[in-house]
Amino acid sequence: MGVLSRVDTPEDVRRLNVAELRELAEEIREFLVRKVAATGGHLGPNLGVVELTIALHRVFDSPADPLIFDTGHQAYVHKILTGRKDRFDDLRKQGGLSGYPSRAESPHDWVESSHASAALSYADGLAKAFALGGQDRHVVAVVGDGALTGGMCWEALNNIAAAPDRPVVVVVNDNGRSYAPTIGGLADRLTALRTQPAYEHALDAGKRLLKSIPRVGESAYSMVHAVKAGIKDAVSPQELFSDLGLKYVGPVDGHDVVAMESALRRAKDFGGPVVVHAVTQKGRGYEHAENHVADQMHACDPIDPLTGRPLGGAKARGWTSVFSEELIEHARRRSDIVAITAAMPGPTGLSAFGERFPDRMFDVGIAEQHAMASAAGLALGGMHPVVAIYSTFLNRAFDQLLMDVALLKQPVTVVLDRAGITGPDGASHNGMWDLSLLGIIPGIRVAAPRDAATLREELGEALAVTDGPTVLRFPKGSVAEDLTAVERIDGVDVLRAADPESAVRTQRGDVLIVAVGPFARIGLAAAELLAPEGVSVTVVDPRWVLPVSDTVVKLAENYRLVVTLEDSGLHGGIGSTVSARLRSVGLDVPTRDLGVPQQFLDHASRDQVLEQLGLTPTDVARRIAGWLDAR
């Protein structure tokens, strides 16, 4: 019987000897490869935090001592050690285990952490709350070195450092080796010494003694302090943290469970804010992840665990790759086109752009706010920036888009990948908020391509705009074959006419479906289901969904019912915008909006979520028929 089979709680982990801990780490890696290969998920990051997480659960008393994982996709090992290993067969599946910490799953999960750079702020607030309540509890935040490129981390660290007696332990999971490990007895000795409370008392006493010497005391103290600081900074990469007033332990080999536990115990015993710097290897212990050049299998679909290759053969062409190729074509012809990403060049399709135009590609780190304001500066300087981010991360850059780009009428194109329902990553990653946010920005123009052809077309149109921001949004996954319009009227594509024999501009019918982006396919399928019932339906794709086209308004006059269909939130979405526009011109035609309710939706596949929401062709046709009957 293996060690892992005997571990269901942190208490079980604390009972193990060193040999068993090392065996446990290897068994966990084998478990992760086997399970994530079957379901897909974040494999590389979790292979890199096995020993680190084991040590955390041996030193701290979770859940009394909160363990908060920044970018919570690195919490799989935490889930295994807190009684959830038997649920990994359903990881990221409907009704199954979340791919992120989940308060609904376990008291060991304090937050639903998934967006980067927030863990330290959670930790700061929790530590303050415990102090105010007189509770003697430690708070631990595990933050990846990538997340430290986000300014929010440093805002939090500044506040954490302001309370030297508040027990917050910040574990920097450095899996990119952006800090060089320090080797040698002097560094080890200084690390141990600096975090002993007796050392702090001695420092205070020495400081008082030196400063009390008449005339030379202050200078003597300054000289000794400078020598001490110089030695520390020469032997370990800590100045970023020590200059804030934070104690520093490390660098520590994050794959040596004994060393990791020892470092964490020293940090815990200190009793104040401490940074523990753990150097880890992403993808550790799985050859195909270690050798995966792009990102050490950061996230993967189901794979063959023996070869590391995706199951099911080659993937169909994706939206992201179409965007990537088209942007490069435009950039070849125009030297003013530059690209910006917030630490995600691969997932947003900008890696190839960066290889082709290295001087025109800017990865700003996990800093969407800065990305947008920097784009405004580039535009002011004569460039046309393209900011490519996930739709869900637009929330972070909204103020800059509103006040630094739109207010100044700067030509910045924002490309929102993973718009709409994304599925397995759950509530935090569904891109369902963007249209509600964008709809309140004066002068903004938003396109929603329905296929590869319209994505290429609309990207070109966006890059031609010189007097304000433009936005393109498209979903996750593969792009289906192109849908050809039967007619284009002033930029609006008619995909199906209620009466194919008469002019679309003047014909009358029962229903006008205004379908946004890929939902055009649902609209067309619903129209075909309604046709045998004698319901005449015209389906249009406005292409540019904001502002609402005059053509949509004119067409609406000729129908008994206008139905909008969108892969985004209903409140403030395209449906409500179309309805408001029709009312503003005094058009009294009934409207109905079909889209995503303003709810936090649990993880499941995209198709499962759409079925659950009644956004399938059958459901749409049934609801339209019911609305017509009610009239």
UniProtKB/Swiss-Prot annotation:
Residue sites binding thiamine diphosphate per the record: H73, S114, H115, A116, G146, A147, N175, Y286, E368
GO BP of this protein: 1-deoxy-D-xylulose 5-phosphate biosynthetic process; isopentenyl diphosphate biosynthetic process, methylerythritol 4-phosphate pathway; terpenoid biosynthetic process; thiamine biosynthetic process
Cofactor binding remark: Binds 1 Mg(2+) ion per subunit.
Organism: Nocardia farcinica (strain IFM 10152)
GO cellular component: cytosol
UniProt keywords, alphabetically: Isoprene biosynthesis, Magnesium, Metal-binding, Thiamine biosynthesis, Thiamine pyrophosphate, Transferase
Designated name of the protein: 1-deoxy-D-xylulose-5-phosphate synthase
Quaternary organization: Homodimer.
Enzyme's top EC category: transferase
Pfam families: DXP_synthase_N (PF13292), Transket_pyr (PF02779), Transketolase_C (PF02780)
This protein's pathway: Metabolic intermediate biosynthesis; 1-deoxy-D-xylulose 5-phosphate biosynthesis; 1-deoxy-D-xylulose 5-phosphate from D-glyceraldehyde 3-phosphate and pyruvate: step 1/1
PROSITE patterns associated with the record: TRANSKETOLASE_2 (PS00802)
SUPFAM superfamilies on file: Thiamin diphosphate-binding fold (THDP-binding), TK C-terminal domain-like
Xref: SMART domains: Transket_pyr
Cofactor: Mg(2+); thiamine diphosphate
